[in-house]
Amino acid sequence: MASLLQSDRVVYLVQGEKKVRAPLSQLYFCRYCSELRSLECVSHEVDSHYCPSCLENMPSAEAKLKKNRCANCFDCPGCMHTLSTRATSISTQLPDDPAKTTMKKAYYLACGFCRWTSRDVGMADKSVASGGWQEPENPHTQRMNKLIEYYQQLAQKEKVERDRKKLARRRNYMPLAFSDKYGLGTRLQRPRAGASISTLAGLSLKEGEDQKEIKIEPAQAVDEVEPLPEDYYTRPVNLTEVTTLQQRLLQPDFQPVCASQLYPRHKHLLIKRSLRCRKCEHNLSKPEFNPTSIKFKIQQVAVNYIPEVRIMSIPNLRYMKESQVLLTLTNPVENLTHVTLLECEEGDPDNTNSTAKVVVPPKELVLAGKDAAAEYDELAEPQDFQDDPDIIAFRKANKVGIFIKVTPQREEGEVTVCFKMKHDFKNLAAPIRPIEESDQGTEVIWLTQHVELSLGPLLP
């Protein structure tokens, strides 16, 4: 029964740009293409940026300007948890009478997990609770900004040269004399969309502005390297004061060696993204814009459209001995679904991981529609499907248990079974053309899924 909850032991094959095998819970279903989609078959679009701590959302331009970090929230440099602002009272001298003191509120950053505080690295307390925390400056910031500006200008120059070469290939194949003779010169001189070759002759980076060329100084190698201190190899090392590799990599601009050099970092922003089918460009997933909302405007996950196969019980599997495995089929839609299991044909290019022979039920299986109210109604009369007890183990609501026979073909290793699942699907997506009176309201199509089961190791 433990295998019933291990949904990753049953994978479905996605026939996309690259063949992907994944559990049904990790896949999407495009109702317009009527095909499964994985995360590698969809386009990812960023909808909004937000801070996971204060839940403040911001547009993409502002997030890019802030380097995808929140201005008010910080991460602990020691354990990477969110820092909280603590308030304390300190005594300060009055400006009028230095002999007298008064109590004043001060704020500092503290971590509730590793007990790190901003006072450990000598950061001054603030008189306000939010903002105003000073950050250490990187000595190489000016050099990096200069290099970025230089390469941006260089990339813009190369783009202008490419555009000039493309438009230079466009030639007027009609001779000028022929054009002037029949009065076509004025017609050909009408303004066209885009820039002409003559206008590109004096094309610059910024039209109407003189942009100075940025020059950078090349990096120079240093002949002499600063030697290590004399006591570098002899002084004792206190491991509590040495930073870990993860702590150094989280601050690549400083890479602190000692714990006294650890400064808080602004918290990284998270995104809400939409997923779009690359084939038909329809949305498969679109969340709400509000960061506090966990709802979706569109969420076409495969478990809501494709019958789900799960392993309920696995007997002891032995080499070349037939065993009976109990599977469950779940119908996620509200209407009846007809399912037919088929064995993979010889030479099937998708059947590459199979290590056992499988015998599936030859008859068509009928799954009842999903009804949340009837699932908890014990007095409801069950529907009579005239099930064969040799094939159907049990039936409850929209679930049915079936038997398949497995014969391992290898003496060692994991046992993997592959088969095809053919089922009908009523496409409820909006049709492209209006439905005529003679047409039916919903179109029934038949889909075939390639399913692989991992049944575990063989017994000796």
Curated annotation (Swiss-Prot):
Modified positions (Phosphothreonine) are 407
Supply the alphabetized keyword list: Acetylation, Coiled coil, Cytoplasm, Cytoskeleton, Isopeptide bond, Phosphoprotein, Ubl conjugation
Task: Give an example GO cellular component term for this record.
Answer: stress fiber
| Entry annotated with the keyword Repressor | no
Q: Where the protein is mainly located, per its record?
A: cytoplasm
Phosphoserine is found on 196
The PTM N-acetylalanine maps to 2
Q: Which residues form a coiled coil?
A: 152-172
Localization per record: Cytoplasm, Cytoskeleton; Cytoplasm, Cytoskeleton, Microtubule organizing center, Centrosome; Cytoplasm, Cytoskeleton, Stress fiber; Cytoplasm, Cell cortex
Q: Name the domain of life this protein comes from.
A: Eukaryota
Q: Where is this cross-link: Glycyl lysine isopeptide (Lys-Gly) (interchain with G-Cter in SUMO2)?
A: 215
Q: Among its keywords, does the record have Oxidoreductase? A: no
Function according to Swiss-Prot or TrEMBL: Part of the dynactin complex that activates the molecular motor dynein for ultra-processive transport along microtubules.
- Record text on subunit structure and interactions: Subunit of dynactin, a multiprotein complex part of a tripartite complex with dynein and a adapter, such as BICDL1, BICD2 or HOOK3. The dynactin complex is built around ACTR1A/ACTB filament and consists of an actin-related filament composed of a shoulder domain, a pointed end and a barbed end. Its length is defined by its flexible shoulder domain. The soulder is composed of 2 DCTN1 subunits, 4 DCTN2 and 2 DCTN3. The 4 DCNT2 (via N-terminus) bind the ACTR1A filament and act as molecular rulers to determine the length. The pointed end is important for binding dynein-dynactin cargo adapters.
**Similarity comment:** Belongs to the dynactin subunit 4 family.
- Protein name according to UniProt: Dynactin subunit 4
Gene source species: Pongo abelii
Q: Give the encoding gene's name.
A: DCTN4
